[in-house]
Amino acid sequence: MAHRVLLLLSLASAAAVAAAVDAEDPLIRQVVPGGDDNDLELNAESHFLSFVQRFGKSYKDADEHAYRLSVFKDNLRRARRHQLLDPSAEHGVTKFSDLTPAEFRRTYLGLRKSRRALLRELGESAHEAPVLPTDGLPDDFDWRDHGAVGPVKNQGSCGSCWSFSASGALEGAHYLATGKLEVLSEQQFVDCDHECDSSEPDSCDSGCNGGLMTTAFSYLQKAGGLESEKDYPYTGSDGKCKFDKSKIVASVQNFSVVSVDEAQISANLIKHGPLAIGINAAYMQTYIGGVSCPYICGRHLDHGVLLVGYGASGFAPIRLKDKPYWIIKNSWGENWGENGYYKICRGSNVRNKCGVDSMVSTVSAVHASKE
């Protein structure tokens, strides 16, 4: 009898501990550099239970559950490394913490390699944007404050980030041209856009298997435009093209790529609206918030996102001064990052961090109304 009571008390205690571990748990919220591996190992199962409950995760059997727990433990250690390498941001448990880095890249990153990005680094491009004046640029600017940015969307388990970047840029351009913010269709790109880069005939837009924003704009010029999300809703999977030209709500007039110069990027952002950009997403799987400015980050681009603004007041604890940053809209839902947004540092001391300046394109829209 006493043994049974002791067992019940132990189970109740374990349940209470699990319930207490929630989104505000300091390890869940942020992997603290001062912790040790033994603490992570001892508490990993409780943190994993909280993670499963918070994000509604389910696994097919006990073996899969055990495997995902082991991946979760690896990602706790990885988030700690990211925290050490990127101290001005917060890194910790996200909804992707049960995925290996390879699974994450394969499922959520879909920006195809492009020779055009290399040409831009070398100052060459067939669609180079004209140089704009940069005197008098504001210290802070955010298109969300001016009505040109739609709601944060979720690409799901589909490498269609490029389509969200392209549609977001056209949403902003269409707003500047017409004064109306339309929520545009990414699924039209996924199903119907098979445009190839002229410099790389084998690199074509391929739905959930990846694509490029510039080739997406080329497709729209040929197709006539893009339908609304309402008329052509997102499914998160490759499907048969159902494009209806009579339902076009936004069309591309022209597009160009912006030089690898932060002042020019800022000037184009203000003049043309949100910009379609590529980025190295190496630190984004564990990102929770703050200004990301990792000491080490490659410039290999693997994720398409939308640049919507910039600021100058991101606090940098290492240098005890403000760190300027870009404001980036992502396509992983509002329960990632800062309500779906990412901040990454900019400025002369950190030029082109994670390749953020390497692939930037602007688009101009013409008005297209339903007949």
Swiss-Prot record:
Signal peptide start and end residues: 1-18
UniProt cross-references to Pfam families, sorted A to Z: Inhibitor_I29 (PF08246), Peptidase_C1 (PF00112)
Glycosites: N254
GO terms (BP aspect): proteolysis involved in protein catabolic process
Entry keyword Transit peptide: no
Keywords in alphabetical order: Disulfide bond, Glycoprotein, Hydrolase, Protease, Signal, Thiol protease, Zymogen
Keyword Protease part of the UniProt annotation: yes
Active-site residues, record numbering mapped to chain: C161, H303, N330
Enzymatic class: hydrolase
Residues making up the propeptide: 19-136
Tissue-level expression: Expressed during the late stages of seed ripening, in mature seeds and during germination.
Any single GO CC term annotated in Swiss-Prot or TrEMBL for this entry: extracellular space
SS bonds (residue pairs): C158-C208, C192-C241, C297-C354
Its job: Involved in the degradation of the storage protein zein. May play a role in proteolysis during emergencies.
PANTHER family per the UniProt record, alphabetical: CYSTEINE PROTEASE FAMILY C1-RELATED
Name the UniProt record assigns to this protein: Cysteine proteinase 1
Name of the encoding gene: CCP1
